[in-house]
From Swiss-Prot:
Gene Ontology terms for molecular function: GTP binding; GTPase activity; ribosome binding
Start and end residues of each tr-type G domain: 7-189
Protein name per UniProt: Elongation factor 4
Lineage: Bacteria, Bacillati, Cyanobacteriota, Cyanophyceae, Oscillatoriophycideae
Main localization category: membrane
Biological source species: Rippkaea orientalis (strain PCC 8801 / RF-1) (Cyanothece sp. (strain PCC 8801))
């Protein structure tokens, strides 16, 4: 099991869009090489989380080592490094691709090339990987292998003359795939004699052993008991356990250049072993780390509040536990006058946010309210000081700020031609700037727009899917900050500002958003004994307002006929009471009102 010459090692990953059959293909490879016994096999073997199985997406990376005897009689070791296919996790993808020499590009032969596939192929090309194209699901009645092969040639620029036609489900073409990995993917470089450098491509927290780090040895070799240093954090650890993933962990004594494995060294949190960091020996460190390490910064923020104030501690514990496994998640305590105690959390993107929320509710039985997601704004004050703000209620007043800049992203959508018009309309309505349009084949078009991230975080993805009947796919990346005339929109209920409803919007849209929001709140807030004004304001200027009429008790019911002055006296007494009630009464804002912000139609 242990000593394998470097020339017989093949490291590869699988690139595919959601639902194009990546996990099924991985299962089939594990089965055909005898890595996983038939009786232990279950669907999507490498997707460990229930949520991953349910949504059919891969969130955390996995890795597996397979022993394969090729047709030429030689024994090879194949290391499959799984990648998450979703755009929020593109940094993780780039690191796991950096740990490989080749990639299988799996495309559904009934669907064609999708945006995320394309984004990941570009990452693979940046890392100089050998790409092997595979058409999957060719046993389906709707499969069109010729059309899709042409599409791959045109869009990606790969030679598809000897493309592999396969069906992971039916087990067609699996031997061909294994042979092509052996013959086409180059072996790792033989650099066993150099100082140790290894790339971390994933890590997760284990309650008994601390953080388990998955890594690929690039140069040199590492043994159990070695003292290693992580170059980005500068911390040193002693390796207690070293092993290979097959896919279950099998401890061994040493690993050398080209091999993939795991180690445990009593590391406390995942933050200490960041993805992309370089491992080297403490005694003989390498001169410089491997290139490409960056810290994953959260892009989207929202407030999470427990519906029941007693669950605050539970929420904090749950976030702490999730944080152990998710270095990209950030959170800090926050108090809101409307919602009480909670946390302001930062995420990589929308999918990441949804998954964290769903895991909190599902794995920790919490009932949560979320505020509208916001992005990180860059504010320059009059004194020339630049601060980053992720919460609209922290924005300095207009007279103290000089400019607000917001993050912009470049969105690439791949869609059937019929839906191009409606998707362009969607982007225009979100302040998008048209950049480029490319026709791939007769039926597929790529449309490129630059958009403010704030316009995409609420429901852009849902709109994209509903307008294109689910056929369009998108991929985005950050392109920098730009200055825009942005204002803070406050919502006042009965004269008091409700901090959880505050938002930062573009000046041209402020009136429409304010109008829509006040109308929505008028429906949702119950009537009180006194008249309740709802206002949308920018600074001290009210731009839209609605009133909830008072419930009126009939105080004259007991006066039959009788004297007008008697009736006047009762009415004046009622008016006085209402006035007093209005000055000291509080208005309950129901939870649906906070959700209303998320459901506003930005049109």
């Amino acid at each position: 099991m242990t000593d394998v010459p470097v020339s017989r090692i093949r490291n590869f990953s699988i690139i595919a869009h959601i639902d194009h059959g990546k996990s099924t293909l991985a299962d089939r490879l594990l089965q055909d090489t005898g890595t996983v016994q038939q009786r232990q096999m279950k669907e999507q073997f490498l997707d460990n989380m229930d949520l991953e199985r349910e949504r059919g997406i891969t969130i955390k990376l996995q890795a597996a080592r397979m022993n394969y005897t090729a047709k030429d009689g030689e024994k090879y070791v194949l290391n499959l490094i799984d990648t998450p296919g979703h755009v929020d996790f593109s940094y993780e993808v780039s690191r796991s691709l950096a740990a490989c020499e080749g990639a299988l590009l799996v495309v559904d032969s009934s669907q064609g090339v999708e945006a995320q596939t394309l984004a990941n192929v570009y990452l693979a090309l940046d890392n100089n990987l050998e790409i092997i194209p595979i058409l999957n699901k060719i046993d389906l009645p709707g499969s069109e292998p010729e059309r899709v092969a042409n599409e791959i040639e045109e869009v990606v620029g790969l030679d598809c003359s000897n493309i592999i036609k396969a069906s992971a489900k039916a087990g067609i073409g699996i031997d061909e795939i294994l042979e092509s990995i052996v013959h086409l993917v180059p072996p790792p470089q033989d650099t066993v004699d150099q100082p140790l450098r290894a790339l971390i491509f994933d890590s997760y927290y284990d309650a008994y052993r601390g953080v388990i780090v998955y890594f690929r040895v690039m140069d040199g070799q590492v043994k159990k008991g070695d003292r290693v240093r992580l170059m980005a954090s500068g911390k040193e650890y002693e390796i207690d356990e070293l092993g290979i993933l097959s896919p279950n962990q099998i401890p061994i004594d040493s690993l050398h250049a080209g091999e993939v494995g795991y180690f445990a060294a009593a590391i406390k949190t995942v933050e200490d072993a960041r993805v992309g960091d370089t491992i080297t020996l403490a005694e003989k460190p390498a001169k410089e780390p491997l290139p490409g390490y960056t810290e994953a910064n959260p892009m989207v923020f929202c407030g999470l509040f427990p519906t029941d104030a007693d669950q605050y501690e539970d929420l904090r514990e749950a976030l702490e536990k999730l944080k152990l496994n998710d270095a990209a998640l950030s959170y800090e305590p926050e108090t809101s006058t409307a919602m009480g105690f909670g946390f302001r959390c930062g995420f990589l993107g929308l999918l990441h946010m949804e998954i964290v929320q769903e895991r909190l509710e599902r794995e920790y039985n919490l009932d949560l309210i979320t505020t509208a997601p916001s992005v990180v704004y860059r504010v320059t004050t009059v004194d020339g000081e630049v601060t980053e703000i992720d919460n609209p209620s922290l924005l300095p007043p207009p007279q103290k700020r000089e400019k607000i800049e917001e993050p912009y992203i470049q969105v690439e959508m791949i869609t059937p031609e019929t839906y191009v018009g409606t998707l362009m309309e969607l982007c225009q309505s979100r302040r998008g700037v048209f950049k480029d349009m490319r026709y791939f084949t007769l039926s597929r078009t790529a449309v490129v727009y630059e958009l403010p991230l704030a316009e995409v975080v609420t429901d852009f993805f849902d709109q994209l899917k509903s307008r294109s009947r689910g056929y369009a796919s998108m991929e985005y990346h950050l392109i920098g900050y730009r200055e825009n005339p942005l204002v803070k929109l406050d919502i006042l209920v009965n004269g008091d500002s409700v901090d959880a409803l505050a938002m930062i919007v573009h000046r041209d849209k402020a009136y429409y958003v304010g109008r829509a929001l006040t109308e929505k709140l008028k429906e949702l807030i119950p009537r009180h004994q006194f008249k309740v004004p709802i206002q949308a304001a920018i600074g001290s200027k009210v731009i839209a307002s609605e009133h909830i009429p008072a419930l009126r008790k009939d105080v004259l019911a007991k006066c039959y006929g009788g004297d007008i002055s008697r009736k006047k006296k009762l009415l004046q007494k009622q008016a006085k009471g209402k006035k007093r009630m209005k000055s000291i009464g509080t208005v309950d804002v129901p939870q649906e009102a906070f959700m209303a912000v998320l459901k506003l139609d930005p049109q």
